[in-house]
């Protein structure tokens, strides 16, 4: 019983020492960025070279390789690192800041090419739009002509109605005036005969 109790306290300090060793080094992301900066290779630094640099300069545990892979993937997704070759944690990597300084010189060339290409595409589009615009006014003119033809048609009908209405009272007035004139003519010879 005494031997077992003496063995257990001896095991506890070993675990505490292992925890202390893991806290001696900075974050894996910081160590990876430092390794890439130290190499300064044009093609980018590989994962194996990053691991060697970290193991040589920092006190790292046995599970350092797996944690380096995870931290590399996180840095790539966040944009701190850019992968020049390979997929995932394998391949070569560069710092994103170094690439941003080089890329602006290349971007203006691409923008000039893009500015030239739309001009060529724009010419056929304008030609295609112009006949469509020319066709639309023709349709509008046809509609105006049809409307103009329909409008004069009702106007003569109205004129005919007004003429027929005016003609009827004129005829009636002539007939009425003619009737009283006849008896006056008959009465005049009678008066002349009496005087003689």
Curated annotation (Swiss-Prot):
Name by which UniProt lists this protein: Histone H1.0-B
Organism the protein comes from: Xenopus laevis
SUPFAM superfamilies reported for this sequence: Winged helix' DNA-binding domain
Gene designation per UniProt: h1-0-b
Database matches in Pfam families: Linker_histone
Entry's Gene Ontology molecular function annotations: double-stranded DNA binding; nucleosomal DNA binding; structural constituent of chromatin
Record region (Disordered): 1-29, 86-196
Keywords: Chromosome, DNA condensation, DNA-binding, Nucleus
All residue ranges annotated as the H15 domain in the record: 24-97
InterPro entries named among the record's database cross-references: H1/H5, Histone_H1/H5_H15, WH-like_DNA-bd_sf, WH_DNA-bd_sf
């Amino acid at each position: 019983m005494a031997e077992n109790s003496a063995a257990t306290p001896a095991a506890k300090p070993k675990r505490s020492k292992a925890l202390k060793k893991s806290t001696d080094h900075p974050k894996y992301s910081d160590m990876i960025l430092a390794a890439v900066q130290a190499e300064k290779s044009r093609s980018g630094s590989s994962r194996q070279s990053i691991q060697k640099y970290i193991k040589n300069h920092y006190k790292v545990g046995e599970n350092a390789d797996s944690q380096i892979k995870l931290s590399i993937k996180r840095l790539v997704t966040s944009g701190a690192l850019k992968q020049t070759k390979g997929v995932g944690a394998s391949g070569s990597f560069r710092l994103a800041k170094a690439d941003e300084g080089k890329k602006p010189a290349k971007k203006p060339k691409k923008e000039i090419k893009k500015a030239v290409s739309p001009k060529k595409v724009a010419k056929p589009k304008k030609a295609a739009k112009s006949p469509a615009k020319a066709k639309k006014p023709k349709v509008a003119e046809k509609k105006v002509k049809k409307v103009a033809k329909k409008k004069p048609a009702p106007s003569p009908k109205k004129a005919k109605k007004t003429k027929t209405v005016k003609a009827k009272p004129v005829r009636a007035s002539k007939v009425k005036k003619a009737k009283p004139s006849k008896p006056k003519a008959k009465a005049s010879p009678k008066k002349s005969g009496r005087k003689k």
